[in-house]
Amino acid sequence: TSILGMHFPKNEDHQKFSRRRLAFEEFFYLQLYALEEKKKNNYLKGIEHHYKKDQNQRFLSQLDFELTDAQKRVWSEIRSDLESKKTMSRLLQGDVGSGKTVVAALSLLETMANDYQGVFMAPTEILAEQHYLNFKELLSKFDYKIHLLTGSVKSSERKNIEAEIEKGNSDLIIGTHALFQESLNYDKPGLIVIDEQHRFGVEQRHSLKEKGDNPDLLIMTATPIPRSMAMLIYGDLDLSVIDEMPPGRKKIATFWRRENRRKKIYEFAKEKIDEGRQSYIVCSLIEKSEEMPKLISAEELYKDL
């Protein structure tokens, strides 16, 4: 009836109601599928980590700041998952600068202290390299071997790194999608952390579990997703939110503007640049694509500005 109403509506309202009915059905089945997957996760036997208090305290004592109450709460939620017998599947949400990386470091330390491998995937090579350097510094006082694996790593070096990973001589592996290629076999993965990967759907997350014996999974995002939408998109995941910024950090203000406000946005950016500050414009494409003509590329925008 709704399909008929979409194509042969009696009036404009009839067409709108028919469309809403079909949209509701699509979201309903999507949510139902996600909830079924979450139910399956509850029956999956995961890795039961044992809390290593000494190492935890040692890591926290070397930091030149204290965790916020929100970080402590979120870490407690993650720790509870790690110590349980079921597999963790959790989404960690928090603004840029809220301290998600430190929480991820605590989680990865826990899995490494239990003699499992930690895996951290970033969406780009630049971010992977930044995280690699960051974790090297954060974990410099611990005797763990950390490797970086991205698509630009030379073939000979890649083979050596992959061999170290397969033999269990690598404790923490940081990289991009190269971490999940079929040819790469892990020795004993305990926790997989994925940073800002929105296109990693339910099926892709299942494929990660096949890399080991149901390793725990933590997905991090700085995108301010409303709880209701997060449950729709990531319905098979539990949700933790860092809703507090460290002292001295300003809260991130996020705004959405229509296309007709583009000129005003550029004027605002120019004002900030004139004040000696910086502005960043992120484009979906580097160069113009015939397949996606409506999207503005970085090269085009650079010439226009």
Report each predicted region and the residues it spans.
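Residues within well-ordered alpha-helical secondary structure of globular protein domains
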Residues: 33, 77-80, 164, 271
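Upstream accessory/linker segments immediately N-terminal to the RecA-like ATPase cores of bacterial MutS
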Residues: 1-62
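Generic recognition of stable, solvent-exposed alpha-helical segments in well-folded globular domains
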Residues: 22-26, 69-73, 77, 91, ...
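Alpha-helical structural signal
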Residues: 24, 28, 75, 102-105, ...
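Conserved pre-motif I regulatory segment
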Residues: 46-93
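Generic amphipathic alpha-helical segments used as scaffolds and interaction surfaces in large
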Residues: 14-22, 62-65, 122, 126, ...
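Short secondary-structure junctions and interdomain/linker hinges
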Residues: 6-14, 34, 38-41, 66, ...
